[in-house]
């Protein structure tokens, strides 16, 4: 599906969402590595910092509501697969919303499999897949960037538990503590770039 086609499909669904006639969620997985995330550092002298090994990972499969910015998550410490997506679908179905639900998600194989599509059909949830290589069209990518900035950059956590708690706490407060900061970031506008020649010297 081309970008022009997906935008034509998204536009009426956004209009319904803003009118309260539909719930549109953007879905994506983020893999937070328990390692060093430096901000900006430059100096003549060598500088040693405390840093975790980077061998542990906190996986978050999230669904971000396009209007309220509520985040529904499924988390684990192994990997995200089709069963994780099915768990998320069941969580969304359990919300008991009185309007149709549309999920906007990328073309990851585990999100397009027969199991996921069967569960979505059973729950009456529409799956709207984005074209390949178009993270700019996935609203939730902006949230992941915000979470990394808030919780990871230039931060050191003594243990993995504190690391995961910081991420969960940030996601829990998208509608409260972080509401003002996210207000301008999570707006329903998208960037797309035409093909352009790269200039080299």
Feature map (PLM): residue ranges:
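Short functional hotspots at interaction and active-site rims
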Residues: 1-201
């Amino acid at each position: 599906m081309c970008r022009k086609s997906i935008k034509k499909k998204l536009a009426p669904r956004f209009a319904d969402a803003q009118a309260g006639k539909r719930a549109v969620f953007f879905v994506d997985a983020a893999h937070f590595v328990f390692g060093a995330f430096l901000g900006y550092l430059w100096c003549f002298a060598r500088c040693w910092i405390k840093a975790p090994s980077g061998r542990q990972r906190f996986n978050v499969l999230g669904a971000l509501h396009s209007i309220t910015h509520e985040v529904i998550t499924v988390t684990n410490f192994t990997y995200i697969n089709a069963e994780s997506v099915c768990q998320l679908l069941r969580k969304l179905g359990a919300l008991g919303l009185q309007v149709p639900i549309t999920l906007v998600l990328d073309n990851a194989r585990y999100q397009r499999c027969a199991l996921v599509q069967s569960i979505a059909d059973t729950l009456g949830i529409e799956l709207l897949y984005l074209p390949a290589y178009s993270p700019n069209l996935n609203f939730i990518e902006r949230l992941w960037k915000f979470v990394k900035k808030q919780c990871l950059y230039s931060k050191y956590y003594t243990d993995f538990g504190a690391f995961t708690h910081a991420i969960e706490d940030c996601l829990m407060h998208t509608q409260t503590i972080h509401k003002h900061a996210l207000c301008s970031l999570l707006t329903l506008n998208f960037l797309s770039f035409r093909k352009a020649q790269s200039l080299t010297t």
